[in-house]
Amino acid sequence: MAYFVYCIECEDGSIYTGITTDVARRFEEHAMGKGGHYTRAHKVKRVVHAESRTTRSEALKREAEIKSWKKEKKLVFISASRARHKKGVK
């Protein structure tokens, strides 16, 4: 089973990072107020990044890495990731 590390942009401009096995389902849970405490307080806007990992352990390590970054680094990472995705490069 694949695990995904995802980043959601919230309406206040903040970035929430989490892991799941189903990004679309998890986003809907956040949008309905059934996600984490953070997204109950910060309304979600859109998924801005998702990447897969083979194991839950790998996903948790990557989630922790991204969460440790300052907002500016997250925004640069997301922008570069989206640019690569548009070009079809992973």
In which residue ranges do the predicted regions lie?
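GIY-YIG nuclease catalytic motif and its immediate N-terminal context
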Residues: M1-R40, V44-R53, S57-F77, S81-K90
